[in-house]
Amino acid sequence: RAGCVEVDPPGVRFSFVSHMAGLYFHIPFCSHKCGYCNLFSLQTNRADYIATYLETLHKQAQQLSPLTTGLAFDSFAIGGGTPLLLTVSQLEYLLETAALFGVHPSHAFTSIETSPEYADPARLTWLK
């Protein structure tokens, strides 16, 4: 697209036109592969895999965030896999990672993919 720049390290996607931007975090973990899904996903909830992935995503954000100085992120999406497979503390860490780009859900249209399997009271309260 004319005027659009995309940078796609694993797990992070952001694109921007002018000074508005959107940020996408891909969380590839799920309990099972849905028949309609054609996205990269890992059928696991192993804590060590998830922790390593989130730490790596955070390090990438630290490296890339200087490239986005001066941009206003008007959208933020978390997809997967099943992002709500993460614990509430891991979801909080994901928001801390987004904050490195200056993204906060109260200032950007925010969406997160989920499954009824993980829509428990603690996660639903966190989503509010």
Labelled PLM ranges:
Residues 27, 54, 58-61:
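Short amphipathic alpha-helical/adjacent loop interface patches that line ligand
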